[in-house]
Amino acid sequence: MKTGLRFFDRNVIRKEENGMTIVLQKACVCIDDVEGLSNAFNLIPAVRSLITAHNSYYEDENGVAYLVFEGKGISRCNHEDTYDEKIGFRIAETRAQKDVFNKAAKFFNGITYFIEKVFYDDLMDKLTTITDAVYACNDHELDIK
C-alpha cells in the first residue's frame, strides 16, 4: 500500500529560553490519498491518535485533504548551526533513541520531526507506543512517503 503524505509549507521559528533553543513550527501536510492514509493509520492506531489529537483537518474545494498542526520542540544544542534542520534528531540523540526515529523516518518521512517535537514533553511515556507503531509498519510492509 502506498500513501501520499507530503509537506507543502513549513515555518520554523527559534527562540532562546533558559539557555535552550525552543523550536516552534507550523506545518501543513497534503494527504494525496485520504482513504489510504486512514487505512494506514488503522494499522497503527497509536500514531493515528497522536496525530489526530494535535491537528486540524480540512478539505479544499477540490477535495484535497490537509492536516495543519503546530509543534514545539526543545533542542539542547546551544548553537543553531549544530541543529539538524531537515529532521532534527538532537532530542532523540540526547535521549539515546535515535534509532527509533530513524526507523520511523523510513515510513513517516516528513512527520518524523513532527512526532518528536509535538510530543517532546511526554515523549518518554509515548516512546514504547511509537516504537510499536514503527514495528507495525514493518510487519505490514507499509510504505508512506
Question: What are the language-model segments listed below?
Answer:
Residues M1-K145:
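Catalytic phosphate/metal-binding cores of nucleic-acid and nucleotide-processing enzymes, i.e., regions
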